[in-house]
Amino acid sequence: MPYYRRRVSPIKPGDPIDYKDVDLLRRFITERGKILPRRITGLTARQQRDLTRAIKQARVLALLPFINREG
């Protein structure tokens, strides 16, 4: 029977994901401004869904850029 390493979520299950917490949200977007997929972030499905909503809301409120044109 193969042994699979259990993945640990970078955000604790009870911690809220808020659109105002820009430092937390920046950890989950690329340098170009794209949202990282769940297989890279290691989040649960629920956390990834909440994170995506928070990032999109922060973009609409101009807390995060839609795209990053640096480089």
Swiss-Prot record:
Which keywords does this Swiss-Prot/TrEMBL entry list? Ribonucleoprotein, Ribosomal protein, RNA-binding, rRNA-binding
The protein's matches in PROSITE patterns, at most eight in alphabetical order, are given as: RIBOSOMAL_S18
The cellular component terms of Gene Ontology attached to this UniProt record, alphabetical and capped at eight, are:
cytosolic small ribosomal subunit
Q: Does the keyword Ribonucleoprotein apply?
A: yes
InterPro entries assigned: Ribosomal_bS18, Ribosomal_bS18_CS, Ribosomal_bS18_sf
- Entry annotated with the keyword Membrane: no
**From which domain of life does this come?**
Bacteria
Name the SUPFAM superfamilies on file.
Ribosomal protein S18
Q: Which GO terms of the molecular function aspect are on file?
A: small ribosomal subunit rRNA binding; structural constituent of ribosome
Q: Could you give a single Gene Ontology term from the biological process aspect? A: translation
Q: How does it assemble?
A: Part of the 30S ribosomal subunit. Forms a tight heterodimer with protein bS6.
Similarity remark: Belongs to the bacterial ribosomal protein bS18 family.
NCBIfam families hit by this protein: S18
Q: What does this protein do?
A: Binds as a heterodimer with protein bS6 to the central domain of the 16S rRNA, where it helps stabilize the platform of the 30S subunit.
Please give the name of this protein. Answer: Small ribosomal subunit protein bS18
Taxonomic lineage: Bacteria, Bacillati, Cyanobacteriota, Cyanophyceae, Acaryochloridales
Instruction: Name the gene for this chain.
Output: rpsR
